[in-house]
Amino acid sequence: MPALSSFEVLAESLLPKGVTPLTNVPFVLQAYFVQVSYPNTPKAAPIQFDLTFEETTNFNQGVGQPGLLAQFLDEKGLANNYAGFFTAGKPNGFLAQQIAPGQTKIYSVTVLPPSGAARAAAPIPQAGTGWRGIASLNPKTANLLIATPTQRQIYFSADMQTITGSVVYAVPTVSGKTVI
């Protein structure tokens, strides 16, 4: 599978482990998004593809796999949860996806912040969940899709009641190109 880019998703306190907080310490959620577009070309047919995620760290920090939210925005702009992201015996990711000419879909993975008992079980220093690895996009027909990966971060107050900031930045692709 052609590697697209590295990825990192996390939900954690910004306080390094072992440091005693003197004030409220912000909490960050970081998500990974891939916008997949198929330019409208004459006589083009829909394309199937897989967007897979190979971990380079075991996804067991914090709440682990149950804390992951996988979604995609379809061609109508509607958000859809994707329940089959972690399926035993198959690659992790969005499998058997289809896109038609002239469409754009946006895929995202993020970690939900711990709540209730899960938050109490995760110690505040570096509390939360993190997952890192390599994302790959494997279309059935090459060189027709445009893929743009981004990281998005949302910063919350320590009690997670207020958003204090956010940022979006492009993630370099392995090839340096966006045509896949």
Predicted segments, located by residue:
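Conserved long hydrophobic alpha-helices within structured protein cores
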Residues: 1-12, 46-55, 61-68, 102, ...
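Beta-sheet-dominated interaction scaffolds and their linkers
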Residues: 1-37, 168-180
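Short regulatory "switch" loops immediately downstream of catalytic or recognition motifs
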Residues: 12-13, 28, 52-58, 112-117, ...
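Glycine-rich, flexible loop segments associated with nucleotide phosphate handling
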Residues: 23-33, 86-97, 124-134
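Asparagine-centered strand-capping/turn motif at beta-strand->loop junctions
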Residues: 24, 30-58
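Intrinsically disordered, low-complexity acidic/polar segments
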Residues: 43-45, 58-60, 118, 144-146
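Intrinsically disordered, low-complexity Pro/Gly/Ser/Thr-rich segments with frequent PxxP/GP/PP motifs
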Residues: 57-125
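Terminal connector regions
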Residues: 105-180
